Regions:
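N-terminal active-site segment of His-dependent metallophosphoesterases
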Residues: 1-56, 164-165
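Short, mixed charged/polar active-site loops
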Residues: 2-4, 210, 266-269
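Residue-level marker for buried hydrophobic side chains located in beta-strands
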Residues: 5-7, 37-39, 76-77, 156, ...
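Residue-level detection of beta-strand scaffold positions
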Residues: 6, 121, 260-262
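Composition- and surface-driven signal marking solvent-exposed, interaction-prone regions
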Residues: 20, 135-137, 261-263
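Extended active-site neighborhood of metal-dependent phosphoesterases/phosphodiesterases
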Residues: 26, 45-154, 167-190, 196-252, ...
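C-terminal/domain-terminus segments
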Residues: 261-274
């Protein structure tokens, strides 16, 4: 049982902000508990990594999180900055890390895993770098994972949001169709992302069903001040903050408790029930 499921996006800057958020995670998890970190992409700024031996794995990941025990696993997805050079280096690093019992987990650019009472589906939203064949291959594979899902809660995450009032805005049409299609097929309860450097909770209606979007892109760079409420014309914004920090999900009595945290205080809480 994982005590905390921490959402961390847009973190790999090497900046002071990344180190401050790392200290926040240390305070949340403490030393004895076992916790899970969902890495929401842009793992290594500005241009990802060239090879598995790239020094940025050390400076922008290992060093900032060195005080977090290796029993706390970072289940990563790929962001747009991770595609600037060789995205496969991050997968290779993840496979080696898992073999050595280290933190970084990334067996593929899309995959599934389970924790507590949740089935997670990790997707690669960088579809502008994919052929239509590769997009369909990912889509069909995630559907296969969903067919085997047994847990009460279904959470999917990738780097790009479906809805957002931040600077990057809503997903483009082709990506929106992919994300919505998977949400509908798998009865996904929550979709999580980074990309915009803010924390947001958005209530969406997809096929007459409430689905929640969590954005947490405040893990390593100053917050994005841009706000465009026009992007909420078919959704409801429940919370927004552009202060650096994380989100934390706890499983309590089959409910999910979501906390939005900056480096000083808890900003907002929400309980998911079903």
């Amino acid at each position: 049982m994982y005590k905390n499921i921490i959402l961390l996006g847009d973190m790999g800057s090497g900046y002071t902000e990344q180190h401050e958020v790392a200290k926040l995670i240390e305070r949340i998890i403490k030393k004895k508990s076992k916790n899970l970190i969902c890495g929401l992409g842009d793992n290594i700024y500005e241009d990802g990594c060239k090879t598995i031996n790239d020094i940025k794995f050390k400076t922008n990941f290992e060093d900032p999180y060195k005080n977090i025990s290796d029993k706390n696993k970072f289940h990563m997805c790929l962001g747009n900055h991770d595609y600037h050079s060789n995205y496969k280096a991050q997968i290779q690093y993840g496979i080696l890390s898992s073999k050595l019992g280290k933190k970084w987990v990334m067996p593929h650019n899309y995959y599934t895993y389970s924790a507590n009472n949740i089935d997670f589906f990790v997707i690669d939203t960088n579809i502008e770098h994919m052929t239509d064949l590769l997009i369909r291959k990912q889509y069909n594979k995630i559907k296969q994972y969903m067919n085997k899902s047994k847990n009460k809660w279904k959470i999917m995450y990738g780097h790009h949001p479906l809805r957002s009032i931040g600077g990057h805005g809503n997903a483009r049409k082709k990506l929106e169709q992919m994300i919505k299609g998977l949400i509908s097929y798998g009865n996904v309860d929550i979709y999580m992302s980074g990309h915009d450097h803010s924390k947001q909770l958005i209530k969406m209606n997809i096929n007459n069903r409430d689905v929640y979007q969590i954005i947490c892109g405040t893990g390593g760079k100053p917050g994005d001040p841009y706000i465009n409420m026009n992007n909420m014309r078919d959704s409801e914004l429940l919370f927004f903050s552009n202060i650096i920090g994380v989100c934390n999900i706890r499983s309590i009595d089959n409910n999910l408790i979501l906390d939005f945290l900056n480096t000083k205080i808890k900003e907002f809480s929400y309980t998911f029930k079903k």
